[in-house]
């Protein structure tokens, strides 16, 4: 609206097409790119796990540690602060140092370790000790998206990212229900 389009006209997608406006159309686009299926699965499963966490945490915290809504809210606020720190300050540095592939592995490993700590924590302080480790899980998402964009042509990158957003939304709908 205020800033001009930065993408050169030669690299822009063709005009709007109703064929691409189907609700599952963007997800069907992923079928044409088998080289990214593994990375797409990582995006879906990581987001699936992410969406289960806030929807069940209050119940888990009460059953495991006797934390009520107030304490659970404080913990979720800390999770949010740690997420901001990782996203704003650490991801770029870590990816520069490790590269995307290793950053994905580190991020996913930290997520697994964090969830293992959460599940085996016998006390609240043990659970809280897992928060900084689990926060590093956020490294995986942008690195995965970067690798996906490297695997497809520039003419479909926006549509592929849209398809990923659709899958993330689908995970957000399905995961809490399970």
Model-identified regions with their sequence ranges:
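Intracellular helix-loop hinge segments at the cytoplasmic ends of transmembrane helices
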Residues: 59, 143-151
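Small-residue hotspots at the loop-to-helix junctions and early N-terminal turns
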Residues: 69-77, 162
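A late C-terminal transmembrane helix in Major Facilitator Superfamily
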Residues: 155-178
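Helix-to-loop junctions at the C-terminal end of transmembrane segments
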Residues: 86-100
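Juxtamembrane intracellular "pre-TM" segments in multi-pass secondary transporters
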Residues: 4-40, 64
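C-terminal transmembrane helical hairpin of 12-TM major facilitator-type secondary transporters
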Residues: 101-144
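Pair of pore-lining "gating" transmembrane helices in MFS-fold secondary transporters
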Residues: 32-53, 132
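Short amphipathic helix-loop junctions that connect adjacent transmembrane helices
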Residues: 55-72
């Amino acid at each position: 609206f205020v800033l001009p389009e930065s993408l050169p006209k030669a690299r822009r997608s063709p005009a709007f097409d109703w064929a691409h406006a189907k609700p599952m159309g963007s997800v069907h686009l992923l079928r044409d790119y088998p080289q990214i299926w593994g990375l797409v699965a990582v995006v879906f499963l990581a987001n699936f796990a992410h969406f289960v966490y806030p929807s069940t945490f209050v119940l888990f915290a009460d059953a495991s540690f006797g934390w009520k809504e107030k304490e659970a809210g404080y913990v979720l606020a800390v999770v949010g602060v740690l997420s901001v720190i990782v996203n704003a300050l650490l991801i770029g540095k870590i990816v520069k140092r490790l590269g995307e592939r290793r950053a994905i592995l580190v991020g996913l490993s930290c997520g697994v370790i964090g969830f293992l700590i959460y599940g085996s924590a016998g006390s609240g302080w043990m659970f809280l000790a897992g928060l900084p480790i689990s926060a590093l899980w956020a490294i995986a998402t942008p690195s995965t998206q970067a690798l996906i964009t490297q695997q497809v042509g520039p003419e479909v990158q926006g549509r592929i990212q849209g398809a990923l957003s659709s899958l993330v939304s689908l995970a957000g709908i399905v995961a809490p229900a399970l």
